Regions:
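Amphipathic, well-ordered alpha-helical segments in soluble domains
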Residues: 19-22, 26, 99
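Alpha-helical scaffold segments that form or flank carboxylate-/histidine-based iron centers
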Residues: 4-15, 34-55, 83, 88, ...
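Structured surface interface patches that mediate subunit assembly and partner/cofactor docking
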Residues: 1-12, 59-76, 98-101, 105-228
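Extracellular-facing binding/remodeling surfaces
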Residues: 27-35
Length: 228
């Protein structure tokens, strides 16, 4: 299981702030049509994903306040449905300007959602920033070291409840190998490429297969084609 030293934690939060700034900067330049463009998240537009990112720092009091204002959310179960519906409600509640401001206002804060660690916050901002950028054809950088930390956390927790919030791909029988940083996990047919693409694959984003090579990547692409 991934553990963090004090230095690691400082670097991690700096990286979270860096990606929040990049994401807010991207959002500031979008047209109204782009805000309503489908994201990589099923059933969510760019606006929904951005609104979800404003909820990264909710504690118990914040969550209870949200539920009291929107009691119908209690009918949204299981967890993935709750997260989806909360993002939709938040997107309806906040204006474009308020969403961007809320993401920027999170910079410098070290609060994270109850029951999670800063590594989940990192994964959330990295992956969801790509959920916004990729469908819009925007290249939004992610630092390989940060993507590697998030990928390690996702691999280590792939059989826990934390993995239930992502689409699960059958990756245990493959070797995942980054080509831009020293990172590899698993055994089996090779799946190679940038660590950013591996992170997206670990979180169920099959769009990442476009940037991955190897016998294993070919098998995964064929499997996804058959399922389509």
């Amino acid at each position: 299981m991934t553990r963090l030293t004090t230095i690691d934690t400082d670097a991690l939060w700096d990286g979270i702030d860096e990606q929040r700034a990049r994401t807010a900067g991207l959002l500031e330049g979008l047209t109204p049509e782009q805000w309503e463009h489908p994201s990589l998240c099923d059933g969510w537009t760019v606006r929904h994903v951005a609104a979800h990112l404003t909820m990264q720092q909710q504690r118990v009091r914040d969550a209870l306040g949200f539920i009291s204002r929107h009691p119908r959310i209690l009918r949204s179960m299981p967890l993935n449905t709750f997260i989806h519906d909360a993002g939709v409600i938040q997107a309806q509640t906040l204006s474009t300007e308020e969403i961007i401001a809320a993401i920027r206002n999170g910079m410098g804060s070290r609060r994270h959602n109850l029951g999670l660690t800063p590594l989940e916050t990192l994964t959330d901002i990295l992956v969801h920033s790509q959920d916004i950028a990729i469908p819009l054809g925007v290249d939004l950088p992610m630092r390989p070291a940060l993507s590697a930390a998030a990928a390690t956390r996702r691999w280590d927790t792939r059989n826990t409840w934390l993995a239930t919030v992502n689409r699960r791909l059958p990756l245990d029988s493959y070797q995942l190998r980054a080509t831009d940083t020293d990172w590899s996990r698993g055994q089996g047919p090779d799946v190679s490429g940038p660590i950013s693409a591996i992170l997206l694959l670990l979180t169920g984003r099959t769009a990442a297969l476009e940037h991955l090579t190897g016998d294993g990547a070919d098998v995964l692409r064929l499997t996804q084609t058959r399922l389509a």
